[in-house]
Amino acid sequence: MNIYSNYYQFKHIASSDLEVPKRLLSIIKFLRKNYKNFTEIQEYKDVNYFLRFLHENDRKEINNLLYTLSNSQYDHCRKCYWYLGELPPKKDTKYKNAKTFDITSKQKNNKIICEMCEESMTDINLRCTFHKDNTDTSYNWNTHLVLQNMICTIYTSLVENIKDNQLVNDFMLLTRPPGHHSSTDIISGFCYMNWVYLMSQFLINTLNYKVCIIDLDLHHGNGTEIMVKDKENLLFLDLHYFARNFYPGTGNEKKFVADNVINVNMRKNSKDKDYLKTVQSKFETIGDFNPDVFIISMGCDIIINDPFDIMKCSTSLYKQVFDLLKKTFNKKIILALEGGYEADNVHNTVKSFL
């Protein structure tokens, strides 16, 4: 199993205490030392090598997003998210004690001090901002560079495993930030670009492949659903927890989305056997679709002891799903990390493939 990681992921600082660099630190250190088929991609400039293989609309959306991120004003305190200037119109608990604040009135010795928590905001590294009215996914001065590094990582992982117009190896992307909550006009849930969708489009456009995306993250892949619905050569199967007021609030299995979208709501405390049985129950539909490749959105937040504490799966589940798909369909499989906020769970899930 070839494993790839975006070298600059540890430069990415999110607004959450969950989506943090340390969740991947132990497994990255282990792979660097012990696994010869592990590659960290440092390139971040030549994103157009990848974008040229995408549809024109996808290229425009990505370039527009990168431009927006690289030209943003960073006006929130990274520690408490106090806003410098006029408050955002959206009501949010982060701003419940806030009041309009003139940035020039809170300067001490030429330093900008956060009025709420008294932290320095002079250094741009200590500031962030949010996309439109979204307050769960922040970005700062280098977010666009981290995303460019991720795009280059995807491109490299694909081309290194393609030979004679065929995908010849399985591989894994051990990367952050995740992607399955993002779509063309949505930055949400720690996600900025939808990596599994972009990979599917590369494979469809270059190899004329049919792609089956299977999302097993705890949360519904709402961004992926938006991107793939009614698209030719794509089938999307999403197993996730669904409950009132549980993020992102989409993915009700009782609601029809599109012929190529299958949502399955998993019960709380579901275990390996429940996921395997559910995936297997969709094999007839998958067989009728006859994919050339599987892409698995690998969310380790369904594993026992994750901070969400909803599902009770083991760290071997994804390897079991991998083996089941291999045995049944004998197709190449790409795994892409999504959520999962207990470092040991991510570490041991990856090690199960080595």
What would you call each of these model-derived segments?
Residues 1-354:
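HDAC/HDAC-like amidohydrolase catalytic core signature
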